[in-house]
Design a protein with these regions (language model features):
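Metal-cofactor-binding active-site regions of metalloenzymes
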Residues: 1-191, 198-204, 210-219, 223-240
Length: 241
């Protein structure tokens, strides 16, 4: 059965590019870019992933991405992921990326997206892995910042399939970003939002994502199982979780 599953062609519809950065690569880029890390070894980074809650996970997630500085860094991050995906016979991917996590550190939006999309093109040609990119907004940043980054993305709309929403959900409900997502839909982009597991007001947030934002997909959303009417609405709309 393991061999059968390994040989199956696959699609990956939920992967955070920055989250695919491997510990050894973190240290390699930190040394190259002169970035000081709070971890003294790749093994310490791995140990930090023994987290208890979403904020603890996000702490290590953002610490890792700080080593990404140049266009080549983003290229290597992305292409190395595609190499691993190809080894698992993944044929199509819709990866997320978090531009605010980089522009807030002084890395230009163009640097980020050019490195990622160059790797996408090479992976399609060399590895047979096709992909379309989803730009995520960080929900613990302001709606104004999200709108600014949507405007930054306007020259690159042909490189995106959609927009998403991730990061810490506490006090950051989906409707905080309703206007941003409405604008993205006007521009022809698909919509998805994270509704992580067992977060504050999770079920009501999923209702808002489904019926008010009218997203095309819900990331995670497993707490919908607590509400039969919500499950029925998701089925009626044909949404993927």
């Amino acid at each position: 059965m393991t061999d059968f599953i390994a040989a199956m062609p696959k699609a990956e519809l939920h992967v955070h590019l920055e989250g695919t950065l491997e510990p050894e690569h973190i240290f390699e880029l930190a040394q190259k870019n002169g970035i000081e890390l709070e971890y003294d070894s790749p093994e310490a980074v791995i140990a930090a992933y023994d987290f208890d809650d979403l904020p603890s996970f996000l702490k290590i997630y953002y610490a890792g991405m700080n080593v990404l500085i140049t266009e080549q860094d983003f290229y290597e991050l992305t292409y190395r992921y595609f190499e691993r995906a190809a080894a698992d016979n993944v044929r199509y991917v819709e990866p997320f990326f978090d531009p605010q996590g980089h522009t807030s550190r002084g890395v230009a939006f163009k640097t980020v997206i050019d490195g990622i999309t160059r790797a996408q093109a090479d992976a399609a040609e060399n590895l047979g892995v096709r992909s379309r990119l989803i730009m995520c907004f960080l929900r613990d940043m302001s709606a104004e910042s999200a709108m600014e980054h949507l405007e930054m993305a306007k020259p690159y709309l042909d490189r995106l399939i959609g927009v998403g929403l991730d990061s810490d959900e506490k006090d950051n409900p989906p409707l905080k970003f309703a206007d941003v997502f409405a604008k993205a839909r006007e521009w022809g982009l698909k919509l998805t939002m994270h509704c992580d597991v067992d977060q504050e007001n999770t079920v009501s947030n999923i209702w808002d994502v489904v019926t008010k934002v009218e997203a095309d997909r819900v990331d995670h959303g497993v707490n919908s199982l607590e509400d039969e009417a919500l499950c029925a609405e998701i089925v009626t709309r044909g949404l993927g979780l």
